[in-house]
Swiss-Prot record:
InterPro entries: Aldolase_TIM, OMPdecase, OMPdecase_AS, OMPdecase_bac, OMPdeCOase_dom, RibuloseP-bd_barrel. One of its GO terms (molecular function) is orotidine-5'-phosphate decarboxylase activity. The active site is at K63 (proton donor). Catalyzes the decarboxylation of orotidine 5'-monophosphate (OMP) to uridine 5'-monophosphate (UMP). The keyword Lyase applies. This is Orotidine 5'-phosphate decarboxylase. Pathway: Pyrimidine metabolism; UMP biosynthesis via de novo pathway; UMP from orotate: step 2/2. It comes from Streptococcus equi subsp. zooepidemicus (strain MGCS10565). Substrate binds at residues 11, 34, 61-70, 117, 179, 188, 208-209. It catalyses: orotidine 5'-phosphate + H(+) = UMP + CO2. GO terms for cellular component: cytosol. Homodimer. HAMAP family: OMPdecase_type1_B (MF_01200_B).
């Protein structure tokens, strides 16, 4: 179920900057955008309602991680915003993941974060005290996520092939850490180009700065979209 539109990360701190950025695109162009913690905590549910009013799809990336009942009730609130996708932390455990699914319902896509693409194996071992390999940790989280009946995971594109060999068909992999050829990788440590991500089986890709900080964001978006779909 590969999504043809790259997801644009709206990594802006304010409503006005989002409005200014989205106004660059033709009114009839339907985008898929990511609203993360900074923007959501600054502007609240109104930013989601505004973006949805323009006809765009919304990936609300809040990475919930709390006791099951709290996650369930929070997801029920988020479901009323009409979001298309959202996230929880796989480390919260199967019970929490199932509670998230119950609270959100069956409409929106619900995916779990495995290991952040900014995390190296050394950091994982030192900071999380997980002494396996990074891939083994990601695969463990992916299998537990599938067991909880979620739709998929957030992972590095480097891990997609291994994940899909371990989970049921239709399990989706959303991959951040995507950069066009020659672009600055920023704080990401495990990156791929859009074309490489497609070839390896990614279903969704997320990009922020290569589009939002481009001299011509609309042109940059369409170039990346063309690379993703070729």
């Amino acid at each position: 179920m590969r999504e043809e539109r790259p997801i644009i990360a709206l990594d802006f701190p304010s409503f006005e900057e989002v409005k200014s950025f989205l106004s660059l695109f033709p009114a009839d162009e339907r985008l898929y955008v990511k609203i993360g913690m900074e923007l959501y905590y600054a502007e609240g549910p109104d930013i989601v309602r505004y973006v949805k009013s323009l006809g765009h799809s919304v990936f609300l990336d809040l990475k919930l991680h709390d006791i099951p009942n709290t996650v369930k009730s929070t997801m029920a609130v988020l479901s009323r915003l009409g979001i298309d996708m959202t996230t929880v932390q796989a480390a919260g455990g199967v019970e929490m993941l199932r509670a998230a699914r119950e609270g959100l319902g069956q409409g929106p896509i619900l995916i779990a974060v495995t290991q952040l693409t900014s995390t190296s194996e050394e950091q994982m071992r030192e900071d999380q005290n997980i002494q396996s390999t990074l891939l083994a940790s990601v695969l463990h989280y992916a299998k537990r996520t599938a067991q909880a009946k979620l739709d998929g995971v957030v992972c590095s594109a480097h891990e997609v092939k291994a994940i899909k060999s371990e989970v049921p068909a239709g399990f989706v992999c959303l991959t951040p850490g995507i950069r066009p050829t020659g672009a600055d990788i920023g704080d990401q440590k495990r990156v791929m180009t859009p074309h490489q991500a497609r070839a390896i089986g990614s279903d969704y890709i997320v990009l922020g700065r290569p589009i939002t900080q481009a001299t011509d964001p609309v042109k940059a978006y369409h170039q990346i979209k063309a690379e993703w779909n070729r």
